[in-house]
A protein has these predicted regions:
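N-terminal loops that bind phosphate or other acidic moieties
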Residues: 1-77, 81-83, 102-137, 147-274
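Basic polycationic patches enriched in arginine
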Residues: 81, 89, 94-97, 273-274
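Short acidic/histidine-rich active-site segments
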Residues: 143
Length: 274
C-alpha cells in the first residue's frame, strides 16, 4: 500500500504481462506525490500537511488529539483545538466543544484527514518544490526526529544512501546550545541512533535547548529550499510519539490546513444531504 487517496489501498497492482513485481522508481514516487498535490489543489486547498509515512501520520493524529500548548501562546493552542475538535471527541482539551459530532461523522472526518496527508517518503525537497510550483501557500511537515533530523543539516532527501549527518547535526546543535561537555559530544558522535543520542542529551539536561537550535536551523533550510515562495514548517516527535517541538510557522500552517479540511468536510456533508 502507498496512498489511499489514489486508490492504492489494501494490496498492490501489477501492470504489464510478466507478473514480475518491481520496486517503484524514485521518479514514480515523486510523480505520486505530485498527483496527490494536484488532487488537493483541484479541491481548492492552499495549505499542505506532509508526512514521511505511516509513523508520522500516526504521531500527528496523536498530536491533534492532545492539542499540546508547548511552543504556542494560549490563543494558538486553543486555535488548533478549535480546528481539530471534531476529529476526536475523546480529546480532553476539546471534548466540551464537540458534543454535536456523532461517531460516523468522526470516522468520515478522520478519513478525510488521512486522505489529505501527503506521503512524501524521503523526498522532503521534491515535495516542497512541487508544492511551490503548484502555488500552494504553505506546507507543514510532521514526523519522527530520526528521519527529520537530517533537515537540520540541509539534507532534503532523507534516504540513508543519500546522506546521514544525524549525529553531526545533533552534535553541532548541542554545541550551539551551549554545552562544553566533551564527553557528551563524544557520546553523541558514537551513537548508533538518534534516540540514543537524544537520551544522552536528556541525561545531560540539554535536550530541549538542542532541539530548539535544531528547529531554527531546520526552519532556515526549509525556507531556503522553498525560496520563500511558500511558508514552511515542521513538527517533530520522538520514537513513542511524544511531541518534541515545532518551527515558528508550523502552528499557523497547521491551523490553516485544518481549517480548509473542516470547510471541505462541511461542504461534502451538505452535498450529501442534497
Amino acid at each position: 500500500t502507498f496512498n489511499s487517496v489514489l486508490g492504492i489501498e489494501g494490496g498492490i497492482s501489477v501492470l504489464g504481462t510478466s507478473g514480475i513485481v518491481e520496486p517503484m522508481s524514485e521518479e514514480a514516487l515523486v510523480e505520486t506525490i505530485r498527483t496527490h498535490l494536484n488532487v488537493l489543489k483541484a479541491e481548492g486547498r492552499r495549505w499542505v500537511i506532509a508526512v514521511p509515512g505511516n509513523m508520522g501520520a500516526g504521531f500527528l493524529q496523536t498530536y491533534l488529539k492532545s492539542c499540546p500548548g508547548k511552543y504556542k501562546s494560549k490563543d494558538e493552542a486553543s486555535g488548533i483545538c478549535d480546528q481539530t475538535e471534531q476529529l476526536d471527541r475523546q480529546s480532553s482539551d476539546c471534548s466540551d466543544r464537540n458534543s454535536s459530532v456523532n461517531p460516523s461523522e468522526q470516522d468520515e472526518q478522520k478519513k478525510s484527514l488521512e486522505k489529505s496527508l501527503v506521503t512524501m517518503s524521503n523526498f522532503v525537497g521534491k515535495t516542497i518544490d512541487i508544492a511551490a510550483e503548484l502555488g500552494f501557500s504553505g506546507i507543514v511537515i510532521a514526523g519522527h526526529m530520526g528521519k527529520l533530523v537530517k533537515i537540520g543539516n540541509g539534507i532534503m532527501n532523507t534516504h540513508s544512501r543519500e546522506a546521514d549527518g544525524r549525529m553531526d547535526t545533533l552534535l553541532s546543535c548541542a554545541l550551539s546550545a551551549g554545552t562544553e561537555d566533551l564527553e557528551l559530544l563524544r557520546k553523541i558522535q558514537g551513537s548508533n541512533t538518534t534516540d540514543e543520542a537524544m537520551d544522552h542529551l536528556k541525561q545531560a539536561g540539554i535536550l530541549e535547548d538542542t532541539i530548539r537550535v535544531f528547529l531554527k536551523r531546520a526552519a532556515w533550510h526549509l525556507a531556503h529550499r522553498s525560496r520563500d515562495e511558500l511558508k514552511t514548517g515542521m513538527i517533530v516527535f520522538g520514537t513513542k510519539g511524544e511531541y518534541l517541538g515545532e518551527t515558528d510557522d508550523a502552528a499557523e500552517i497547521l491551523k490553516e490546513a485544518l481549517s480548509e479540511l473542516k470547510m471541505q468536510s462541511l461542504c461534502e456533508e451538505e452535498d450529501h444531504r442534497r
